[in-house]
Curated annotation (Swiss-Prot):
Induction: By heavy metal ions. It comes from the Eukaryota. Belongs to the BetVI family. Keywords: Pathogenesis-related protein, Plant defense. This is Protein PR-L3. GO terms for biological process: defense response. The lineage of its organism: Eukaryota, Viridiplantae, Streptophyta, Embryophyta, Tracheophyta.
């Protein structure tokens, strides 16, 4: 998804783009 850190089962407060 859009708001995921590593995968679809891990959601975060920010888009994965900011982390990767």
């Amino acid at each position: 998804g859009i708001f995921t850190f590593e995968d679809e089962s891990t959601t975060t407060v920010a888009p994965a783009k900011l982390y990767k």
